[in-house]
Structure formats: C-alpha cells, structure tokens
Amino acid sequence: MRRQEAGTSSLATRVGPEVLTTAAVASVTGCDDPLAAVLLGRPKVIEVLQRSAELIDRVPALAAAHHQIADYHAMRSRFFDAYLADAAAEGIRQCVVLAAGLDTRAFRLPWPDGMTVFEIDQPTVLRYKENALTAHGARPAADWHPVGVESDMPWPRRLWESGFNHNEPTIWLAEGLLPLPDATQDALISEIDGLSAAGSRIAFDDVLGMCSGRSDAPGWLTSRGWWTDVVEARHLPELSGRRDDDAQSYTAHAALVTAEKIA
C-alpha cells in the first residue's frame, strides 16, 4: 500500500520508497549517519537503488529533479530532527513516528532518559530494519517499540497494546505521509487529536496551494485547540545556513507544519 493510499486503519508503506528517501538523505549529508549506510548496504536495498539509478541516469531532467528532491529530504530531515529533540528536551517522553519506514531516529537522536519511541509501519518493513540494525550491533537510544500494523488493523489499538499512554503528552511525526485524500487525512488527524493529551506536539510536511478546496491540515488543527506554525520549505536552505537555491523549484509548494495542543 502506498503512502498516498494509507487509510486511517493502516499506515503501511513499502520498503522501496523508504530506501530512496534514506539514500537521498545519505547522499546529500555525505552519509554522516552510519545507520543509513547499514540500511542501504543490504542486498535487496542495493538492488532497488541500482534499478532506480539506471532509470534516473537515462533522463537528464530526472537526474536534476532527483538531486533537488534529495536536497529537500535532507533539509526536511534535519528540521524534524531538531524539532523532536527540542520537544523531548522540554519534557515530553513519548514519540510516535507514523509510517516510520527506515527512520532511524530512535537510534541516532540524543533522547533523554525515560524516552519511549513508537514506530508504526508494516511488519515486514519494521522487521527488515530491526534485523539490519541488530546485525550491525546498533542499540536504540530510547525505549524503542516497533508497532507492526497490517492493512486490516486499526493502528490506534496496536499502539495502545504496545504501551502507548494517551494521558501523557506525545510528539507525533508524520514525515512524508501527507497530503492524503481529504476524508482520509481528516480522519487520520482526528485520530491523532483524540490520542493527544494537552501539551502534545505534531510535525509533518504538507503541500500548500496546489489544489483549491483541499483539506487544510494546519487549519483543522488550529480549530481544535492546537497552536500551529507553518514554515514554507523554500526557506529551508536559509534555515540550514545555506545560500544556494538548488531545492527551490521542488519546495515552491511544500511546507513544514508543527503544532502544539493547548487544550
């Protein structure tokens, strides 16, 4: 099931797109995340990357677009890294990563003592990641709970069964998951809202101004007691301390949204 098709009962993703996102971040950052190198070095991943590289190399315009997308993904990743680390430093002790894929934040971020990280995705994706990292000897920096969810399972129930406490503030991350079809997106955000105690936070990327009448996720949150901030992605190079505009065309309609539940 593709991210764009993820329903409210399933936050399933495929290994393929997550491999490409991980590769994109690694390529732009000089692979300074050793865990990304671990995940990219396994045979089935190398096969995916080789097929993708062959397709990209055939079309110069596609190669240029790939570089822009990779650049954006790397900047987006660093933005969310900082947001999650700051929220944890301010006292939140549980984080839920939706459609986690090959995300390694449970292992590589400087989580404080007592931090719990839940990762929701297809069981096959989470098993692949766990096996690769375990074989490498990597250890999570938090109390890590991979939450495997099949397509016919309600993900909130699986989250509760894994030890999630909805009475405590939560940091939610939905990186690369939105936008979704209107009804699906509204239902997903409503479920997150219902599971969030006051003081909870959420971070996600969205596409703004592309489709008139499309469900407005930041507006939905604001109307339900969340303080919302929107950073247009075209400002990411500046926020990253860079002056180039390589990612400008790709980020023209992208935005990074963060919000805190006030009531």
From Swiss-Prot:
This is Putative S-adenosyl-L-methionine-dependent methyltransferase Mkms_0098. NCBIfam families: mthyl_TIGR00027 (TIGR00027). Disulfide bonds: none annotated. It comes from Mycobacterium sp. (strain KMS). Exhibits S-adenosyl-L-methionine-dependent methyltransferase activity. GO terms for biological process: methylation. SUPFAM superfamilies: S-adenosyl-L-methionine-dependent methyltransferases. It comes from the Bacteria. Keywords: Methyltransferase, S-adenosyl-L-methionine, Transferase. Its EC number is 2.1.1.-. Belongs to the UPF0677 family. InterPro entries: Ppm1/Ppm2/Tcmp, SAM-dependent_MTases_sf, SAM_mthyl_Trfase_ML2640-like. S-adenosyl-L-methionine binds at residues 121, 150-151. The keyword Phosphoprotein does not apply. GO terms for molecular function: methyltransferase activity.
